[in-house]
């Protein structure tokens, strides 16, 4: 009986010893760790990327170059930058500027500060003005809204005998003219940051214009 107990104890010790893994020395970097053998010990083979389930989120955007992806390889609602798009340039125009400007510096068309003081203070207003803000004597925006422009009365189209399938053309005041519209009523659920592509008739389509190329300009 004692021999049987000793034999079982030794067997358990051997099994336990075999379960311990030797420390491997692999001269390789595995981003997702190492593969394991049947004993659960690491071996010198890289594990594959773990599968991640991406959400079936729908983006109401048109991206000519496709969508960006996150760290898990899932698409996100951001467009890839075009290969033709010029890289953004760093602003370095204030290196030699010794001026102190209370209201900050004037910025150029590229958004870079110039060595020139701004006349206007930083504009802060919690009022939304649908027709724009009034400006002061220096041309700076104020927190007063412009009045709505007076609506011009439109002439009656009783004398117009035309039937227009797509409706009538409207002038700059929004008044109908006795002229047929070539374009159908435009309906599109895609927002185009740089406007919509137009067809051969000059009518808007539900395709977005590409981002315009920027010139490679240095800010000075």
From Swiss-Prot:
GO CC, alphabetical: extracellular region; plasma membrane
Subcellular location: Secreted
GO molecular function, one term: heparin binding
Marked site positions, Reactive bond: 27-28, 60-61, 98-99, 161-162
Domain Antistasin-like, residue spans: 21-46, 54-79, 91-117, 120-145, 154-180, 183-208
Signal sequence residues: 1-19
Keywords: Heparin-binding, Protease inhibitor, Repeat, Secreted, Serine protease inhibitor, Signal
Pfam families documented for this protein: Antistasin (PF02822)
Keyword Protein transport found: no
Tissue and organ expression note: Gland cells. It is more strongly expressed in the head than in the gastric tissue.
UniProt family annotation: Belongs to the protease inhibitor I15 (antistasin) family.
The protein's role, per its UniProt record: This highly disulfide-bonded protein is a potent inhibitor of factor Xa. Facilitates digestion of tissues and may also protect the gastric tissues from its own digestive enzymes. May have therapeutic utility as an anticoagulant. Also exhibits a strong metastatic activity.
Name under which the protein is recorded: Antistasin
Species this protein is from: Hydra vulgaris
């Amino acid at each position: 009986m004692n021999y049987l107990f000793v034999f079982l104890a030794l067997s358990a010790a051997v099994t336990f010893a075999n379960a311990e893994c030797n420390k491997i020395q692999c001269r390789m970097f595995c981003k997702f760790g190492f593969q394991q053998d049947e004993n659960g010990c690491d071996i010198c083979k890289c594990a594959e990327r773990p599968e991640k389930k991406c959400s079936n989120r729908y983006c109401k955007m048109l991206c000519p170059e496709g969508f960006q992806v996150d760290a898990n390889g899932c698409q996100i609602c951001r467009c890839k930058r075009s290969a033709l798009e010029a890289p953004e340039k760093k602003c370095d125009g204030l290196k030699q500027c010794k001026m102190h400007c209370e209201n900050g510096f004037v910025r150029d068309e590229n958004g870079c500060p110039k060595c020139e003081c701004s006349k206007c203070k930083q504009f802060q207003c919690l009022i939304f003005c649908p027709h724009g803000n009034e400006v002061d004597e220096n041309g700076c925006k104020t927190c007063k809204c412009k009045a709505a422009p007076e609506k011009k009365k439109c002439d009656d189209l009783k004398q117009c005998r035309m039937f227009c399938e797509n409706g009538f053309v409207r002038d700059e005041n929004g008044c109908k003219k006795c002229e047929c519209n070539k374009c159908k009523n435009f309906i599109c659920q895609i927002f185009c940051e740089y406007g919509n592509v137009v067809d051969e008739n000059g009518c808007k389509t539900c395709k977005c214009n590409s981002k315009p190329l920027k010139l490679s300009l240095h800010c000075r």
